[in-house]
């Protein structure tokens, strides 16, 4: 689980995160939170999850401005079949 803070809403952040996660073979979701951050849940091989986290920390899409990424290990209670954008 990751929370991405900065200018990450209204800039295509969830869409490009979905694309990158799918490219890495991950499942889960990305959703906007009321505080202006984006929550990302990524499930899959640990190495691929780490690659997504590194991508998030590197700033994600060019249109975004990531200030910080907070992460926390998470054991999902759902079995995600793909990576989706949640609303």
Swiss-Prot record:
Residues 1-87 form the Acylphosphatase-like domain. It holds the Pfam family Acylphosphatase. Gene3D superfamilies: 3.30.70.100. Its EC number is 3.6.1.7. HAMAP family: Acylphosphatase_entero. It comes from the Bacteria. It catalyses: an acyl phosphate + H2O = a carboxylate + phosphate + H(+). It is an enzyme of class 3 (hydrolase). The keyword Hydrolase applies. InterPro entries: Acylphosphatase, Acylphosphatase-like_dom, Acylphosphatase-like_dom_sf, Acylphosphatase_bac, Acylphosphatase_CS. Belongs to the acylphosphatase family. NCBIfam families: PRK14426.1 (NF011000). The keyword Hydrolase applies. This is Acylphosphatase. GO terms for molecular function: acylphosphatase activity. The lineage of its organism: Bacteria, Pseudomonadati, Pseudomonadota, Gammaproteobacteria, Enterobacterales.
